[in-house]
Amino acid sequence: MERSPDVSPGPSRSFKEELLCAVCYDPFRDAVTLRCGHNFCRGCVSRCWEVQVSPTCPVCKDRASPADLRTNHTLNNLVEKLLREEAEGARWTSYRFSRVCRLHRGQLSLFCLEDKELLCCSCQADPRHQGHRVQPVKDTAHDFRAKCRNMEHALREKAKAFWAMRRSYEAIAKHNQVEAAWLEGRIRQEFDKLREFLRVEEQAILDAMAEETRQKQLLADEKMKQLTEETEVLAHEIERLQMEMKEDDVSFLMKHKSRKRRLFCTMEPEPVQPGMLIDVCKYLGSLQYRVWKKMLASVESVPFSFDPNTAAGWLSVSDDLTSVTNHGYRVQVENPERFSSAPCLLGSRVFSQGSHAWEVALGGLQSWRVGVVRVRQDSGAEGHSHSCYHDTRSGFWYVCRTQGVEGDHCVTSDPATSPLVLAIPRRLRVELECEEGELSFYDAERHCHLYTFHARFGEVRPYFYLGGARGAGPPEPLRICPLHISVKEELDG
């Protein structure tokens, strides 16, 4: 029930004055009563007594004590009621004046639909609102409430969308935590393999050096033993010669021939033979380069990897990111880069210039596509699954195997081309010439050309489609073939 506009709620002035503290002249806050009967705020009387030697009542100066303070619950309740009524009176005054036209002081009973303003009856005749559509406040409020209900419904739907998006980010955060733990393990495994390779190579080189050292030490020991024996023989001969020189002349000369033959047969010392030192160059010469070249022979490299973040729910990418298999649909974390309408995925690299080539092992797969797709500038917002038609008009260039009336055959993504009459390849080679605008496909086993696209490709990524197996056997993988790595050595400069 509305109040009369002439009635203003609120306490009387005399009643309000009775509820004011005699110290701060504000309504009581935590009112207390002294023994003399006067009332004050607890904080006010306490501050007064802080500067007094002996506490007294601030009004009548009667002697008082902090122990005499008694909380006045009745007075506190009256103050609370006073403040509540004052607040209600302020709200009522604001409400009453907000419903009155400031210009004509009339009741706001109309609404101008053009200016979106509340009007009184006098405002309707104002030239500013001449010819405008005006209707009663009640009807306008009914119409606007209906619109607000529609807006409320739209906001609720938007809130649901926000919650759904939040759940997507929660799923992404959980996925990233699991993926990070798995990635950390895989990275450590790969570096452990490299460290193990280097450890084995280091030990092999150290063992070879130790063996050479041992062999040359044995040879040196043998030579030193021989020289020691020869030295002892010579010492014995010197001693014998000294004894003969002390004999009389006849005896000395009688042994001259035999002595000469004996001394002539003594051996001459051999010079130090070459190759006795450890071959330092054999072990330290270009050591890192030689180990690196040996490492290349044991490391498998591919021109690019499969990007698991683009793989549709049907596809499972191997741990080394070089093969993919269609195991049937499984729910994956939602992200805009992922294909959702077909079992497709992309390669990890983006090509926009230069020459590039890669080979794909297809084996006996019965449904596949291999080619490239133009990188969409808005793919971060919409993903790659915006179109169900993966053909040249949508920026897809590929060769695929499909099932026809007369059996399986190969076709291209260009609807205007006829089926390729050559046998279905088991290993496909793709060559991309960005500057020339050529994308060529070859049967890598038969070394024959299949088809060449001519177009302005722009930025493209390798594109793959892998259909499900038609039979009951286990699904076959599609693999990226490893590169043959060779090192060309040239003089610097």
UniProtKB/Swiss-Prot annotation:
Reactions this protein catalyses: S-ubiquitinyl-[E2 ubiquitin-conjugating enzyme]-L-cysteine + [acceptor protein]-L-lysine = [E2 ubiquitin-conjugating enzyme]-L-cysteine + N(6)-ubiquitinyl-[acceptor protein]-L-lysine
Main location: cytoplasm
PANTHER family: E3 UBIQUITIN-PROTEIN LIGASE TRIM (PTHR24103)
Keywords of the record: Acetylation, Apoptosis, Coiled coil, Cytoplasm, Metal-binding, Nucleus, Phosphoprotein, Transferase, Ubl conjugation pathway, Zinc, Zinc-finger
Gene Ontology biological process: apoptotic process; innate immune response; negative regulation of mitotic cell cycle; positive regulation of apoptotic process; protein ubiquitination; suppression of viral release by host
Annotated zinc fingers (RING-type), start-end: 21-61
Gene: TRIM35
Biochemical pathway: Protein modification; protein ubiquitination
One cellular component (GO) term of this entry: nucleus
Domain B30.2/SPRY: 284-487
The name this protein goes by in its record: E3 ubiquitin-protein ligase TRIM35
Residues the entry annotates as binding Zn(2+): C101, H104, C123, H129
Record EC number: 2.3.2.27
Matching SMART domains: BBOX, PRY, RING, SPRY
Zinc finger (B box-type) in chain: 96-137
Coiled coil: 210-251
Top EC class for this record: transferase
Alphabetized GO MF terms: ubiquitin protein ligase activity; zinc ion binding
Subcellular location(s) of the protein: Cytoplasm; Nucleus
